[in-house]
Every structure is written in structure tokens, then in C-alpha cells.
């Protein structure tokens, strides 16, 4: 990951900190910063980091390695959105009808690409474990009524919402589990309630 030579070193370092941290989920080491901005001296990088800290752009804990916090990103993470947790799904009723909403779940806004028409379903069972979707997970769903082959969707089958991989073929719809112990569900038609855009799991 190399920063273009189009700004002064301090700006290059700051931009690299943001880019690296967003990509990896943790800040870079001083040596990684040196390599990215073509500096040989770690002391020079430390000097730039100190000046960025004085400007209030970053915060460093000198007692811990890589303990560098980018204020801009920290503020983004503190912005929360409320996503409704949907319980029982009933045919003919809007998915986000008040009667369907069990609770609200707060999530940092930077964890999702947008907050338009999102809802959460609690995952029950192990039919999607090979896609990394486990029993008890919170599935974050973008409300949509259409799907393309290969999408992981929430479909309504006989008044029950199910999370499966969607395929339309030979005039039928195949809802494919991601677990070799389960058979696919083959139907002529079904209601698509939304598309999976994320998973939240508490440890």
C-alpha cells in the first residue's frame, strides 16, 4: 500500500493511517509507515506522529504498541443507527410493520454501507453454516423484493422466513442451504423479503 507522491509527508502519513486502519481494522506500525511514504528514519515518522497528535488528529498511548487512535475514525464509529429486529414474519404484511418489530439494535454507522431499509433477523439453526452464518447470529438484511442467482436472501415460504442462497432455474426457484446435511427447497414462486448484507455475532 503506497501513497502517491502528491502531498507533504505529514499529509501522506495521515492519509496512510486512515487508509490502512480502514482496510486492516488496526493502525500500521512505524516501519510500515516508513515504507509507505518512503522515509528511512523511524524517528522522522515519530516526529510527524507527534505533530499530528498536537493537532488533535490522532491519539497515542505510549505504553502500548500500535495503540494509535485516529480521531476522525473514532468519531465515525460513535455514530450509531437503529436497525429493527424483526420477529415473526406474516404474509401480506410489510416486513417493517410495527407488529413485526421485536426490538431495535444499535450499530456503528460505518459498519454498514448505508442505513436504507435495513432490518435484522435472528438466525435459527445450522442450515447456512458453510456460508459462515451460525445459529444465534444477527443477519443484517437490506429490504428488497428481487434477487439474482447466488444472492443470500430472506425468503417467505409458507409464512416462515428462511435464509438461503437464491437460484432461479428451469422455471423454478431453488433455495439452497449452505450445509451438506440439508436438501434444497424447490418452489415455483416465493416472496423475497431482502438480501443479506452483513452478520453480527457476539462473542
UniProtKB/Swiss-Prot annotation:
CDD domains: HTH_ARSR (cd00090), S24_LexA-like (cd06529). GO terms for biological process: DNA repair; DNA replication; negative regulation of DNA-templated transcription; proteolysis; SOS response. InterPro entries: ArsR-like_HTH, LexA, LexA-like, LexA/Signal_pep-like_sf, LexA_DNA-bd_dom, LexA_repressor, Peptidase_S24_LexA, Peptidase_S24_S26A/B/C. It is an enzyme of class 3 (hydrolase). Its EC number is 3.4.21.88. Residues 30-50 bind DNA. It comes from the Bacteria. The record marks 91-92 as: Cleavage. The keyword DNA damage applies. It catalyses: Hydrolysis of Ala-|-Gly bond in repressor LexA. Transmembrane segments: none annotated. It holds the Pfam family LexA_DNA_bind. Keywords: Autocatalytic cleavage, DNA damage, DNA repair, DNA replication, DNA-binding, Hydrolase, Repressor, SOS response, Transcription, Transcription regulation. The active site is at 127 (for autocatalytic cleavage activity), 164 (for autocatalytic cleavage activity). One of its GO terms (molecular function) is DNA binding. Represses a number of genes involved in the response to DNA damage (SOS response), including recA and lexA. In the presence of single-stranded DNA, RecA interacts with LexA causing an autocatalytic cleavage which disrupts the DNA-binding part of LexA, leading to derepression of the SOS regulon and eventually DNA repair. Belongs to the peptidase S24 family. Homodimer. This is LexA repressor. It comes from Clostridium perfringens (strain 13 / Type A). The gene is lexA.
Amino acid at each position: 500500500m503506497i501513497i502517491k507522491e502528491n502531498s507533504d509527508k505529514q499529509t501522506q502519513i495521515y492519509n496512510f493511517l486512515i487508509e490502512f486502519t480502514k482496510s486492516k481494522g488496526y493502525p500500521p506500525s512505524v516501519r510500515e509507515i516508513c515504507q509507505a511514504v518512503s522515509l528511512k528514519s523511524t524517528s522522522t515518522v515519530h516526529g510527524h506522529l507527534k505533530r499530528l497528535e498536537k493537532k488533535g488528529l490522532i491519539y497515542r498511548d505510549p505504553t502500548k504498541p500500535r495503540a494509535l487512535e485516529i480521531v476522525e475514525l473514532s468519531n465515525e464509529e460513535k455514530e450509531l443507527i437503529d436497525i429493527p429486529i424483526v420477529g415473526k414474519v406474516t404474509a401480506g404484511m410489510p416486513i417493517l410493520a410495527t407488529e413485526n418489530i421485536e426490538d431495535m439494535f444499535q450499530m456503528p454507522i460505518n459498519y454498514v454501507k448505508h442505513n436504507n431499509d435495513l432490518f435484522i433477523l435472528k438466525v435459527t439453526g445450522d442450515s447456512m453454516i458453510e456460508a459462515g452464518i451460525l445459529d444465534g447470529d444477527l443477519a443484517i438484511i437490506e429490504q428488497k423484493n428481487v434477487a439474482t442467482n447466488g444472492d443470500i436472501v430472506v425468503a417467505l415460504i409458507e409464512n416462515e422466513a428462511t435464509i438461503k442462497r437464491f437460484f432461479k432455474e428451469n422455471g423454478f426457484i431453488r433455495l439452497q442451504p449452505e450445509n451438506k446435511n440439508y436438501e434444497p427447497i424447490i418452489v415455483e414462486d416465493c416472496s423475497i423479503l431482502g438480501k443479506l448484507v452483513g452478520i453480527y455475532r457476539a462473542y
